[in-house]
Amino acid sequence: MSTLTRSPAWLALSAHQTEIANRPLRTLFDEDPQRFDKFSLQFKDLLLDYSKQPVDATTIRLLLALAEQQKLVDWLGRMANGEKINFTESRAALHIALRANSPVFMDGVDVTQEVRRVLRQIEQFVQKIHNQSHRGYSGLPITDVVNIGIGGSDLGPVMVTEALKPYHLPQLRTHFVSNLDGAHLSDTLQHINPATTLFVIASKTFTTQETLANAHSARKWFLAGGGSKQDIAAHFVAVSTNREAVSQFGIDPDNMFEFWDWVGGRYSLWSAIGLPIALAVGMEHFHSLLAGAQAMDDHFLTAPFEQNLPVILGLIGIWQINFFHITSQAILPYDQSMHRFPAYLQQLEMESNGKRVTRNGEAVDYSTGIIIWGEPGTNGQHAFYQLLHQGTQKFTADFLAPCRCHHPLSEHHPMLLANFFAQTEALMRGKTEQEVRSELANQNLSADLVEHLLPHRVFPGNHATTSILFKKLDPATLGMLIALYEHKVFVQSVIWEINPFDQWGVELGKQLAGKILAELALDKPVTGHDASTNGLINFYRAQQ
């Protein structure tokens, strides 16, 4: 057993789980009519309801004791004070500085000065695009923005841009290209004009294979479509830390928007990586997005843990993953504009906490991270909810929804939210054999048919969910939501004693792909891999 799993706080939670696991959720609600009031929290217009989780007052007390044992307070301070807590890369993790309204220091230097400088650069550029003083090579204004990036240079910006569609400025269309599959770029290029298109090449190192392949193809298309090399300056900008590589590509370094090595990719949408967001919705709304995140930062760093939304959300996840052995979490936004939110959280959670060794390099003997997936409601109800209600796989789920909608079809929203509320209740309560029998008896069915149908109509229930409601999905609220999950991930990493800010797991496949790419051009059978990989490569080559 590791130090963590034999610690007093961990052992106390293990013993408590044995007891509370025998108390179904519907029983917990039946026993305590005030359960919602006791196990829900509100911050500004954001409501977090965790009363449908298998917790009682003892659970929360023991989880908070675990947080104290793991020195969560100290780690919050270390992050906020710019310590190099990403120790495998010798970097700080200061994404909170990107939205801070007061100085944040690293190595004695207030990094927010540089943040503000780049924000001013972004604002000036966005203004030129919007007022059409920045024009394409033919003199026409820019009508389309194509962001080329992958991972953190794509998932955050595309998620936010989609979520804030009601705030889009009408004169610009925003597109995102990430996949190395040429179809992604090719399909996008079919709908735009080289003379009125701006490409944003987003890569921290400016060496990412997928991004550079797409960027070079986009440049080739641009030059073939009437633009010259001199015109690239008006149509290509870069978001990067590598000025030399940007210049070698042909982009004017003055058109490079900088960010810093203390900004992790999956935490970078608040930085210059968010340029396409600012272009889509304008700087006022981009600043509101930052302000919402900053408000959640302040709450996270100052609120008592028992009233702290990210802390409670993170600890509930620990409770489910490590003591109920849940490996799957559905993210279910009942808002179509949030359709990319599950994919965004996949990277945030799985790339951050998908680690197998502690900060000290010791193999863990407990689960870390969870498989994140999801789909907007009510689409998911007609796809995978069957398994959630009557299947055999264990899971937990977060339901998210706005109380008010942006679109004019307002009569749809009560129906949507009725489904939201119904699903969380149905997953929790289920339907007992007695309830099904009574229901069938009222349908004038024969006794034999009732017995035949009975087992198929029973819902076991007792499925844990967390609900997050908010007034309306505006930029500030979205900023709060994203920061809520960012900090939740950090809380869990502290409990698990892992580094959530590196991602060495993405490297091995990239290294092998480089070797295999050269082999695909050989004129002889490939034999240097295992039999399966050799067979796959040789089959591919035979089809060319």
Swiss-Prot record:
Pathway named in the protein's UniProt entry: Carbohydrate biosynthesis; gluconeogenesis; Carbohydrate degradation; glycolysis; D-glyceraldehyde 3-phosphate and glycerone phosphate from D-glucose: step 2/4
Under catalytic activity, the entry for this protein gives: alpha-D-glucose 6-phosphate = beta-D-fructose 6-phosphate
Q: Where in the cell is it found?
A: Cytoplasm
Q: According to the UniProt record, which cysteines are disulfide-bonded?
A: none
Catalytic residues (UniProt): E351 (proton donor), H382, K510
Read off the Gene3D superfamilies from this record: 1.10.1390.10, Glucose-6-phosphate isomerase like protein, domain 1
- Protein family membership: Belongs to the GPI family.
Q: What is this protein called in UniProt?
A: Glucose-6-phosphate isomerase
Q: Which organism is it from?
A: Nitrosomonas europaea (strain ATCC 19718 / CIP 103999 / KCTC 2705 / NBRC 14298)
